[in-house]
Regions:
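Catalytic glycan-binding domains that act on GlcNAc-containing polysaccharides
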Residues: 1-100
Length: 100
C-alpha cells in the first residue's frame, strides 16, 4: 500500500510489532509480514480487538482501515465512515456464497 502496509492483511509494521508483542508472536523484522500464516494471525487478532473496542463489525472494519484513534476522532465529530466496510462486506458476501 502507499501507507506502507504489508502482507495479505495489509498491516503497517508499527501496528504489527505491537500486535506481535501482545500475542507473543516471534517478530523477525518486517519479513514477518510476508509470512501468510503470521500475517493472517496478526490481522485476525487486530480485527477482533477492533470489534471488541467498537462493538460491531462495521466500525471495526473502519477502525482497521483508518486506525482506531482516527475513527474515534471521526465519531466524536459526528462522522461515521462507511465506504471501506461496505466494500469489504460486499466482497465477503460475493466470495462467501460463490460456488467452488
Amino acid at each position: 500500500s502507499n501507507r506502507g502496509a504489508r502482507g495479505l492483511m495489509q498491516l503497517r509494521p508499527a501496528t504489527a510489532i505491537a500486535l506481535a508483542s501482545e500475542t507473543h508472536l516471534k517478530w523477525r523484522g518486517n519479513r514477518t509480514l510476508f509470512d501468510p500464516e503470521k500475517n493472517i494471525a496478526l490481522g485476525a487478532y487486530y480485527l477482533n480487538k477492533m470489534v471488541s473496542r467498537f462493538g460491531n463489525l462495521t466500525l471495526a472494519l473502519e477502525a482497521y482501515n483508518h486506525g482506531p484513534s482516527r475513527l474515534s476522532k471521526y465519531l466524536r465529530q459526528g462522522y461515521q465512515p462507511k465506504r471501506y466496510s461496505k466494500k469489504v462486506l460486499k466482497n465477503y458476501i460475493k466470495i462467501r456464497f460463490q460456488p467452488i
